[in-house]
Amino acid sequence: MSKKIGILTSGGDAPGMNSAISFLTKSALSLGFEPYLIFDGYSGIIARKILPAKNFPYNGISSFGGTAIGSSRFPEFKKEEVQNKAVEILSEIGISSLVVVGGDGTYNGGYKLHLKGIKVIALPGTIDNDIQFTDYTIGFDTALNTIVETIDKLRDTANSHRRCFVVEVMGRHCQDLALYSAMATGSEILITNTNILSPEEVSQKVLEQFAKGKPSVIVTITENILPNLKEFAAKIEELTKISTRSLEVGHTQRGGRPSAFDRILAAKMAMKAMELINQDKSGLAISYLDGKIQTFDIAKVVSNPVRKTNDLVLEINKINQN
């Protein structure tokens, strides 16, 4: 078994990735492996941006957001000839094992390399929390806290002016950021891809909330639902005659110092990944499920849809309107 191991982060960055990089490197060294850092995701393999980790300041990066080795989306990696080129380059260097940190695209890329003979272990690194068979992904907790802090501040000013705020959060096609931020902040109205409401329906609910004497209303919505957030807010104001503002939380959700939870989660997952590599395992995804670090076949993860939380969305909508 080759002692050279590649480490890469791919797709959208997530707070906690640096903790994963640091602990993967330190764990690899402690087990006698020779870790290599691959910069800018899968594109870094093709561009040969591969350096020995010993030449990189991997200590002390766990407290920083983003990913110190860069990340990118590389749709060309879906082509088999590009995958073959990646295997060729890794083999030339002597890298036989690869740890990938990212979301579903990263998992799919890793699975393809696994099928071509590279030993691959995957860690879930995405703020969207949209990886199957894990309760939490690296970065989700930090992003959630960023959203909660933002909505809490909006609530203060909304209360002062008796306003309605429509807040759009990330999540791609997963509603977890919207759902759990609504739970944490008491957002009166929650709109997700499983609970889409028209401006007329939202306006009626807004009026009902103010009629109960509430000084403000927060509408939390997951991205990729509304064609235009400002127009949606303007329509609510037109229908209710209540001052309504909109806010897209945006890429601040991706940044910031990772929470202690994300740092520890990434560290534990990294240590488990190196344990598996030391056992010459491949094609596995690390998860945090039911309070424990577990493993699943990557094939099973990439072939399953995101878990459903539809009932909880409806329940939170009902509870928060009281």
From Swiss-Prot:
Residues that, per the record, bind substrate: T126, I127, D128, R163, M170, G171, R172, E223, R245, H251, T252, Q253, R254
Keywords per UniProt: Allosteric enzyme, ATP-binding, Cytoplasm, Glycolysis, Kinase, Magnesium, Metal-binding, Nucleotide-binding, Transferase
Catalysed conversion reaction: beta-D-fructose 6-phosphate + ATP = beta-D-fructose 1,6-bisphosphate + ADP + H(+)
InterPro entries in the cross-refs: ATP_PFK (IPR022953), ATP_PFK_prok-type (IPR012003), PFKA_ATP_prok (IPR012828), Phosphofructokinase_CS (IPR015912), Phosphofructokinase_dom (IPR000023), PKF_sf (IPR035966)
Entry function: Catalyzes the phosphorylation of D-fructose 6-phosphate to fructose 1,6-bisphosphate by ATP, the first committing step of glycolysis.
Cross-referenced HAMAP family: Phosphofructokinase_I_B1
Name used for this protein in its record: ATP-dependent 6-phosphofructokinase
Annotated organism of origin: Mesomycoplasma hyopneumoniae (strain 7448)
